[in-house]
Amino acid sequence: MAKKSMIERDKRRSRLVAKYAAKREALKEEFRQAETLEDKLAVHQKLQDLPRNSAPNRRRNRCQVTGRPRSYYRDFGLCRNVLREWAHQGLLPGVTKSSW
């Protein structure tokens, strides 16, 4: 189980990403449309002024059950340990143990 502080920090980052997503996307589009270097620098500075944790790549994918940050399966939102347990218990529809 991950530390509660790390899980909460990641939740806070997720909220910031959602809050600033529209503004960040608008600024990025404005940056693409800017023609002069001065305009691009001004828009870039506005992007830099946004909170650091509002960038989507600062988020970390974590298991929804344990909060484990590694060996995360995106299709399920679970780490490998929980995925294995739940698959054995039949809690994941359509997931079967492979056999060849």
Swiss-Prot record:
Name a biological process GO annotation.
Answer: translation
From the Swiss-Prot or TrEMBL record, what is one GO molecular function term?
structural constituent of ribosome
Task: Give the domain of life.
Answer: Bacteria
Q: Name one GO cellular component term.
A: small ribosomal subunit
| Keywords of the record | Ribonucleoprotein, Ribosomal protein, RNA-binding, rRNA-binding
Note the subunit structure. Part of the 30S ribosomal subunit. Contacts proteins S3 and S10.
Q: What does this protein do?
A: Binds 16S rRNA, required for the assembly of 30S particles and may also be responsible for determining the conformation of the 16S rRNA at the A site.
Give the protein family: Belongs to the universal ribosomal protein uS14 family.
> What protein name is recorded for this chain?
Small ribosomal subunit protein uS14
